[in-house]
A protein has these predicted regions:
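Extended, helix-rich architectural segments
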Residues: 1-206
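N-terminal start-of-chain detector that recognizes signal peptides
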Residues: 51-53, 106-112, 184-185, 205-209, ...
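Generic structural hydrophobic/aromatic packing signal, biased to beta-strands
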Residues: 107, 137, 157, 214, ...
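Short, flexible beta-strand-to-coil junctions
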Residues: 138-144, 215-224, 239-244
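Short, ordered beta-strand-loop transition motifs
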Residues: 141-144, 162-165, 220-231, 328
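Membrane-proximal cytosolic interface modules of multi-pass membrane proteins
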Residues: 206-213, 217-218
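Extended, charged amphipathic alpha-helical segments
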Residues: 227, 231-363
């Protein structure tokens, strides 16, 4: 029996550690950020808001994410400054201050360039961190050496920390079809797997498979061997997570390429906790209360009817202008059943819960 890849063994441990979070995240996703899934595999384009009767939490999460982006990384402002370590006041050196300002402006121009995809990526990250408490995105370089940011949504991210509590190991679980994988890894790498090789021979390019990318500290890094491209402080390995599990590509990075942020973090926990977790009971209650009030309002607007016992013999026409015949000499008639439900009380209670949710999201 072939020995399991040690990197996949570490990944399976990270996967097991994250399982405790996934049911909670799925609940939050269905009520706050329906485009995410953790324990449910839904088809693309399917309806995802069947549990939502009150969208207060969904709107509050979007507004907080937009507010964070506007406040922290506003593309219309110069939202960061550069300093030289060890120098208290660069303003005393006019040339140094001018040079730092020029470099900052060049960096801002790169961030603002559509090709870098920075602002859409950051927005997706803020949506995750306010809902689930953890966000991550990937920083790399394109073929021209320009920075390129890519969103890494939480469903595909598995993280581990070092002794200082800083994330230094990142696993990304993703799927690609054979056409995409061949473009990414090359035919030779694809031929390492007997299953993939057979599918390529058949021309089956649409079949999807699961892959794992592992980025972690390279224990074999040698700073004296800088001419070797794979000799980097951080190693990156892509592995087919099916069948014979070959390594599709081995490379590395000079610095950790993932930016991982946690909203708040409890001692001993790896993943963060966000505003949605804090107010999740109120979010759940809002859905039940809204559903009940909707039913109560329907009974007031379109109440159940009390029909004479012979009504089943004659058709009852409820549409405007409908004619219903009654027996001559009787007082029997169709009457609404008044339930005396207090819809106004339900609405007041809903407003209280809505205010609590909005307060948790700092609105």
């Amino acid at each position: 029996m072939p020995q399991k890849d040690p990197i996949l063994q570490v990944f399976e441990k990270a996967q097991a550690e994250r399982q405790n979070w996934e049911a909670l995240w799925q609940d939050i996703a269905e009520l706050v950020l329906p485009r995410r899934d953790f324990t449910v595999d839904r088809t693309k384009g399917s309806e995802r808001q069947s549990r939502i009767f009150d969208a207060t939490a969904q709107s509050a999460n979007s507004m907080l994410a937009a507010g964070l982006q506007q406040f922290m990384v506003n593309p219309q402002s110069k939202w960061f400054q550069l300093r030289v370590p060890g120098i208290e006041n660069e303003g005393q050196d006019r040339d140094a201050a001018q040079w730092l300002a020029q470099v900052r402006d060049l960096m801002l121009a790169e961030f603002n360039a559509p090709e870098t995809n920075f602002y859409p990526t950051v927005h997706e990250g803020f949506m995750d961190v306010t809902a689930f408490g953890t966000m991550s995105f990937f920083l790399a370089s394109d073929e021209n050496g320009r920075p390129m940011f890519q969103s890494r949504p939480l469903p595909e991210a598995f993280i581990q920390e070092n002794a200082r509590g800083k994330v230094d190991t990142y696993f990304r679980k993703y799927t690609m079809n054979n056409r995409q994988a061949t473009q990414e890894f090359g035919t030779e790498a694809m031929r390492q797997s007997r299953a993939l090789s057979r599918e390529l021979d058949k021309g089956d390019l649409s079949k999807e498979h699961e892959y794992v990318q592992a980025v972690m500290p390279n224990s074999y890094f040698d700073a004296t061997k800088h001419q070797i491209t794979s000799n980097k402080p951080w190693m990156s390995v892509h592995i087919l997570n099916e069948a014979d599990k070959p390594r599709m590509r081995f490379s590395g990075f000079d610095s950790f390429p993932f930016i991982v942020s946690r909203w708040s973090k409890m001692t001993g926990e790896t993943y963060g906790r966000g505003p949605a977790m804090q107010v999740l009971p109120d979010i759940r209650m809002l859905q039940e209360m809204s559903k009940t009030v909707i039913k109560s309002a329907q009974k007031v607007v379109d109440p159940p009817l009390q029909v004479p016992d012979d009504g089943f013999l004659n058709p009852i026409r409820m549409h405007p202008g409908g004619l219903n015949y009654k027996r001559t000499g009787t007082n029997e008639q169709i009457e609404p059943i008044i339930t005396n439900g207090r819809v106004d009380v339900g609405i007041d209670m809903i407003r209280d819960r809505q205010a609590a949710v909005q307060q948790a999201f700092m609105l």
